[in-house]
């Protein structure tokens, strides 16, 4: 079993839509895939959460949510406020390993060092010896946030599977266009995908048909980028639109 963890440079950068896109891409390659969201926050019991959105966009796949907290806060804060037990690293890693799939995609909460329980996504990546895909914003601030995230991965000895722009605008401003060129140069990690802004509102058929065009040719979630390899420049189509 291969595991790929998905983190963001911050909250609301498009992790769930990127997770759905990765899942759809794996399904298009006939790769058995499962998705885990260790902790869901800001959603009441019985309401659809991020995993429901992944299934809606990517299609029926096995999913696993280990904990849910009603307040939209960092998972450990939300757990403490409602008196729920904190997730542990051991139980989470065991649950991920127990999923019956050739590829398991694990979506974190917020950024790399947000506490999911008694641990962070970085801790989980080290425990699973799994690479991490970084979802970044397109505009101002992303150079600093992305480089900080990748430096934290490097310092911990965790492989980076690449950077994906989580919401590429239909009409990118100058900062976004410059960031597209500067991110690989500054981080040493290639941009392996760019998901158009707004595609999370699409239906399943439209979403899955478009997914292959959002990732670099030849890149696959089953073959994550090795950070020891030289970065490449992918000239993704900046005219893509999620409208």
Curated annotation (Swiss-Prot):
ATP binds at residues 12-17, 50, 107-110, 196-198. Keywords: ATP-binding, Biotin biosynthesis, Cytoplasm, Ligase, Magnesium, Metal-binding, Nucleotide-binding. It holds the Pfam family AAA_26. GO terms for molecular function: ATP binding; dethiobiotin synthase activity; magnesium ion binding. Its main location: cytoplasm. Mg(2+) binds at residues 16, 50, 107. The keyword Membrane does not apply. Its EC number is 6.3.3.3. Homodimer. This is ATP-dependent dethiobiotin synthetase BioD. It comes from Nocardia farcinica (strain IFM 10152). The gene is bioD.
């Amino acid at each position: 079993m291969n595991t790929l963890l998905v983190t963001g440079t911050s909250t609301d950068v498009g992790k769930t839509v990127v997770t759905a896109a990765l899942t759809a891409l794996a399904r298009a390659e006939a790769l058995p895939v499962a998705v885990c969201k260790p902790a869901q926050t800001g959603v009441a019991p019985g309401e659809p959460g991020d995993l429901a959105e992944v299934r809606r966009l990517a299609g029926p796949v096995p999913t696993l949510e280990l904990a849910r907290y009603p307040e939209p806060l960092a998972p450990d804060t939300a757990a403490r406020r409602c008196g729920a037990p904190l997730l542990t690293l051991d139980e989470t890693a065991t649950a991920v390993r127990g999923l019956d799939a050739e590829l398991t995609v694990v979506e974190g909460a917020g950024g790399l060092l947000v506490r999911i329980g008694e641990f962070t996504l970085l801790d989980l990546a080290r425990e699973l010896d799994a690479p991490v895909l970084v979802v970044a914003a397109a505009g101002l601030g992303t150079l600093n946030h992305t480089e900080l995230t990748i430096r934290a991965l490097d310092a911990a000895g965790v492989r980076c599977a690449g950077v994906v722009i989580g919401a590429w605008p239909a009409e990118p401003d100058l900062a976004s266009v410059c960031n597209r060129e500067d991110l690989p140069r500054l981080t040493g990690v290639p941009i392996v995908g760019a998901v158009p802004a707004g595609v999370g509102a699409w239906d399943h058929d439209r979403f899955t048909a478009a997914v292959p065009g959002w990732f670099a040719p030849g890149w696959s979630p089953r073959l994550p980028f090795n950070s020891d390899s030289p970065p490449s420049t992918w000239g993704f189509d900046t005219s893509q639109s999620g409208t």
